[in-house]
């Protein structure tokens, strides 16, 4: 019950193994985004970024509903069964292929260009931190991302 209240979002994560995109559905996550401009001492500043909080206990599944397990990016790149796993590939560290996600559930894996064309809330993974200390209820990934879609709305 508490998880539903504090982690109310679903995202569709796309991760790449070589040039093949794989769809990962993450339900029970928290997405906080800032899309637009803010006024600061230096003037208007564009702030198109988001933070995705993923509990370590999240159920990650493919479109068929099969459970997937997390692998760090280098281990994922070497794995022989990428369809059974997922990862977070930050921009600039994955030989041109970085993970991105779409707010909500999408039906199938797609390229970043296709996601930008078809969905409003598209985010590119810029980096992530693993918080694997404290009680299991507090353990999570904190994923920094930048808005990559054409749609910009303050406070979405």
What is each PLM-predicted segment?
Residues 1-43:
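Active-site-proximal polar cores
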Residues 25-156:
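Short, conserved turn/kink motifs that form compact alpha/beta structural patches or helix kinks used as
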